[in-house]
From Swiss-Prot:
One of its GO terms (biological process) is tRNA pseudouridine synthesis. The gene is truA. It holds the Pfam family PseudoU_synth_1. One of its GO terms (molecular function) is RNA binding. This is tRNA pseudouridine synthase A. The keyword Isomerase applies. HAMAP family: TruA. Homodimer. InterPro entries: PsdUridine_synth_cat_dom_sf, PsdUridine_synth_TruA, PsdUridine_synth_TruA_a/b_dom, PsdUridine_synth_TruA_C, TruA/RsuA/RluB/E/F_N. The lineage of its organism: Bacteria, Pseudomonadati, Pseudomonadota, Gammaproteobacteria, Thiotrichales. Its EC number is 5.4.99.12. It comes from the Bacteria. PANTHER family: PSEUDOURIDYLATE SYNTHASE (PTHR11142), TRNA PSEUDOURIDINE SYNTHASE-LIKE 1 (PTHR11142:SF0). NCBIfam families: hisT_truA. Belongs to the tRNA pseudouridine synthase TruA family.
Amino acid sequence: MTLLAIGIEYQGTAYCGWQHQKHCDSVQQQLEKALSYIADEPIGLNCAGRTDTGVHAIGQIAHFETNASRPDKAWIQGVNTQLPNDIRVTWVKPMPEDFHARFSAVARQYRYVIFNRPVHSAILANRVTWENRPLDVKKMHAAAQDLLGENDFSSFRAAGCQASHANRNVQYLQVSRQGNFVFVDIQANAFLHHMVRNIVGTLLEVGRLDKPVEWVSELLKKQDRTQAGMTAPAAGLYFVNALYPESFELPRVVLDELLWQA
């Protein structure tokens, strides 16, 4: 039995998230079907971070066990020929038996992409979130810094979040602009359900000048989801990386690879 890790990118628009669902198509279902065809045996996947309906990924990582012996080309090009055009396997690597895509990860990175101009783009539908009002990115970034470190993120978790507690360690959070695009880049040890989208929805209120910079710090202390901003749309969210101990020697996506032109 061989343990393999794979890198995956996908546009999540057509899928009800990563995880298996009874009544709609998922990224996991498509990948397991394609991998099982190449392996000629049933394949089950475990991933680093389960994404929601409409959320994309450029650096998702998953692992599976197989009795099949195939060259890398079969696990990449062969599997990709069995996948729809909006899902791709980008690399494959044999892993030691103690590796687990989810539990071995020490951090995850997300990027949220906002298209900020009065008129929406005709070609970026479902790939970005449109904001027609001018955004003050400096104020958004300043407010975001109050979320760094280990905190109780109850104000930014979904009502149906099943996590046993709301403590998370946000290690990096930056808001920046490139032309008409505003990027929110965040790294944490783990994330609560809708945590990134709820943070972005809150920062948008600061960027529109509807709320002061200090509001975000106050929300964190209140630990009350009803007091924070609305959940930002799924379309702008990208799972960028899962980070692992260097001993596993896994590829990483460089954030600069996800740049946009306008």
